[in-house]
């Protein structure tokens, strides 16, 4: 019998082993859909981004008007821009849910997969940040100024580092051109790290909601999960297109309709919604270096999660106390997101400080403590 080209061709067999004949657990729920949704988000962002880059000019005197030109004069330019801007929001919604799934079901015990995932998150955050600067509106400019300025808190080399990043003594034309270069490059870096992420995942196979070995009960990825992924994709695209077509500026900042002006500071400088939780943690510490360290820790703490797992059970499916703690953490992150969008005044300052303290306490102290307690409860 002639060999099946799907299984023998050097390139096709890689695709086959990853997307067609991949043995998958029979019981993974819709929470396992977000990986494929993230891949589609990345593809969408790269395609819309390439189309936008064809009409964009990375120069301080032309950037703002080139974006306006794209929206007004390019065929479907308004649509491409709205898809790209809101695609970023959906990218972050998917990645937050994907990380939440990993936390809840103990997927972080696949350490290499988890760590490459954290690197992907950091790269995505960097990409979104430099991309937000490109339209060169007021919030683009001042957001870039505030966040890049944080590096000046690094002792001894800080100020030099910031001026090196800026390419001058303030955010100006050299900053914009290098941010465009980085924003063009990083999505392809993300695509590369995604391949590594999947390579590590396929070493072990997927986890499942029970957190037990599923080797005795595997099903082929296609048609079961390929179809399930298409359903998930459809369900994501409905709200995505609704947002991009009916309310494209809902999540944006009105300040960005004003061209960047170094002489006028906006009353409230704040990032896009997906960075607000980290921004709230940054602002909750009155010291500059302390705030920067807390900001870094708010994301890098994910790298510690595998070492803080003390439970004998992998997932939280049968651990009600840990479940309560998990949803407290989710509520806490929503509070931080809200605080990040508020002005720095009473009572928001103290709420932000309490929420920041709770965030680190839950992850570093309460999760391991409750895990240990649940182990003891199992013995009685």
Curated annotation (Swiss-Prot):
Task: Give the family per the record.
Answer: Belongs to the cytochrome b family.
Please verify whether the record's keywords include Mitochondrion: yes
Organism this protein belongs to:
Pavo muticus (Green peafowl)
- Residues recorded as binding heme b b566, renumbered to this chain, are 98, 197
Q: What is its subcellular localisation?
A: Mitochondrion inner membrane
Per UniProt, a ubiquinone binds at: 202
Instruction: Provide the function of this protein.
Output: Component of the ubiquinol-cytochrome c reductase complex (complex III or cytochrome b-c1 complex) that is part of the mitochondrial respiratory chain. The b-c1 complex mediates electron transfer from ubiquinol to cytochrome c. Contributes to the generation of a proton gradient across the mitochondrial membrane that is then used for ATP synthesis.
Per its UniProt record, what InterPro entries does this chain match? Cyt_b/b6_C, Cyt_b/b6_C_sf, Cyt_b/b6_N, Cytb/b6-like_sf, Cytochrome_b, Cytochrome_b_C_euk/bac, Cytochrome_b_N_euk/bac, Di-haem_cyt_TM
Kindly list the cofactors needed. heme b
BP GO terms, sorted? mitochondrial electron transport, ubiquinol to cytochrome c
Q: What else is known?
A: Heme 1 (or BL or b562) is low-potential and absorbs at about 562 nm, and heme 2 (or BH or b566) is high-potential and absorbs at about 566 nm.
Ranges that cross the membrane: 34-54, 78-99, 114-134, 179-199, 227-247, 289-309, 321-341, 348-368
Cofactor binding note of this UniProt entry? Binds 2 heme b groups non-covalently.
Pfam families (alphabetical)? Cytochrom_B_C (PF00032), Cytochrome_B (PF00033)
Heme: is it a keyword of this entry?
A: yes
This chain's protein is named: Cytochrome b
* Topology of the protein relative to the lipid bilayer: Multi-pass membrane protein
């Amino acid at each position: 019998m002639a060999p099946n080209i799907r299984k023998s061709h050097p390139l096709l067999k890689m695709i086959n082993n990853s997307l067609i004949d991949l043995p998958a657990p029979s019981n993974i729920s819709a929470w396992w859909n977000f990986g494929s949704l993230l891949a589609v988000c990345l593809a969408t962002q790269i395609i819309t981004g390439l189309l936008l880059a064809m009409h964009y000019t990375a120069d301080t005197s032309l950037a703002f008007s080139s974006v306006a030109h794209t929206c007004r004069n390019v065929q479907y330019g308004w649509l491409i821009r709205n898809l790209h801007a809101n695609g970023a929001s959906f990218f972050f919604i998917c990645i937050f849910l994907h990380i939440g799934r990993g936390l809840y079901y103990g997927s972080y015990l696949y350490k290499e997969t988890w760590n490459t995932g954290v690197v992907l998150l950091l790269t995505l955050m960097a990409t979104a940040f430099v991309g937000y600067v490109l339209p060169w509106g007021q919030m683009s400019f001042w957001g870039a100024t505030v966040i890049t300025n944080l590096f000046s808190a690094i002792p001894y080399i800080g100020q030099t580092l910031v001026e090196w990043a800026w390419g001058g003594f303030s955010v100006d034309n050299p900053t914009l051109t290098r941010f465009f270069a980085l924003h063009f490059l990083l999505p392809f870096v993300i695509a590369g790290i995604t391949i590594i992420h999947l390579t590590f995942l396929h070493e072990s196979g997927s986890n499942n909601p029970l957190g037990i070995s599923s080797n005795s009960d595997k099903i082929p990825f296609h048609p079961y999960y390929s179809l399930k992924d298409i359903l998930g994709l459809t369900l994501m695209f409905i709200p995505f297109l609704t947002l991009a077509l009916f309310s494209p500026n809902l999540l944006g900042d009105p300040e960005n309709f004003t061209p960047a002006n170094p002489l006028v500071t906006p009353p409230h400088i704040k990032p896009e919604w997906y960075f607000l939780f980290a921004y709230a943690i940054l602002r909750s510490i009155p010291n500059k270096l302390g705030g920067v360290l807390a900001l870094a820790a708010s994301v890098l703490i994910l790298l510690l999660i595998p070492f803080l797992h003390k439970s004998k059970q992998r997932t939280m499916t049968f651990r009600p106390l840990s479940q309560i703690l998990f949803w407290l953490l989710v509520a806490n992150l929503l509070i931080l997101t809200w605080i990040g969008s508020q002005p720095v005044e009473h009572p928001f300052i103290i709420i932000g400080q309490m929420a920041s303290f709770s965030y680190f306490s839950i992850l570093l102290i309460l999760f391991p403590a409750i895990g240990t307690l649940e182990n003891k409860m199992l013995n009685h």
